Amino acid sequence: MNATPANATTPVESKDIGFIGLGNMGGPMAANLVKAGHRVTGYDLLPEAVEAAAQTGVRPAASAAEAVAGAELVFTMLPTGRHVLGLYTDGGLLAAARPGTLFVDSSTIDVADARAAHDAARAAGHRALDAPVSGGVFGAEAATLTFMAGGEAAEFAQAEPVLTAMGRKIVHCGPAGSGQAAKICNNMILGISMIAISEAFVLGESLGLSQQALYDVASTSSGQCWALTVNCPVPGPVPASPANHDYRPGFAAPLMAKDLGLAANAIREGGVDAALGLRAAELYAAFAEGRGAGEDFSGIIRAIQERSGRDTSTADRSAGTPGGGAV
């Protein structure tokens, strides 16, 4: 495994890039490629997404095939493996690209689908990487994503200088599918962590502990983690967290449910004893189908509060120092 920090001071040769999927993640990623001096042609099924990307310098295409014609690299950021494979094959994306094009799929999909996409690209005379990301919309906008890449070393070496325009950390995880494997495992850690933190805040409140006091202890002790210090599920301690903005997503709960579903499938198929991963998948699936459909994944604390018979406003109501202190 090779890990490379992005270096914005290193000149990067300008590339012709096609970008398919210009939504909440793909749009900012394509914009950062333009900022880095690349020539980007983009397409999305939603005209408003294409129009928004055009405002950032992305050349709009009337079809996916038009977006990839003449491209040296093609990025895809799509909802599921079914969408990726369908676009590659039945959608004609591989056929429309010039021979030897490098396809980089940054969607979060099943490992088997990632390997199938890689094989389809190779069979059509192209090269491929699976390169999902971590960092959410904020990371996409700030060009601070982590890329987890799976594929051959030569393909990674070609893509790496381009990935640095969108990410802060670029990791070559191994052969095809390894990037998706890393993403699934990472988000299983994240989902379990958020549930544990949320349960701890609800338990602490029931014991008369203020949310700020628990944060002050856990954030400087062995309980410290990203889900606490960056995406804290209660309002007050971390002003930029979604909890302070009515749980408007950064990383939407349905996306966490999707990723944990992929992890649960892999757990079952691999015969792995991962009880917490399976339970986290169940909890997020239920949350995403209900009140969490439009919320950040940290909003799961309100589901835990409801099941515990607590007030779901999440304001710091418990004894001790009130919430709202500085980080």
Name these PLM-found stretches.
Residues 40, 60, 128-129, 170, ...:
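Hydrophobic beta-strand scaffold residues
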Residues 179-279, 283-308:
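Helical "substrate-binding/catalytic lid" subdomain
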Residues 64-127:
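Rossmann-fold NAD(P) dinucleotide-binding segment
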Residues 17, 87-89, 109-187:
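Rossmann-fold dinucleotide-binding core
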Residues 2-77, 96, 101, 106, ...:
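NAD(P)+-binding Rossmann beta1-loop-alpha1 motif at the extreme N-terminus of oxidoreductases
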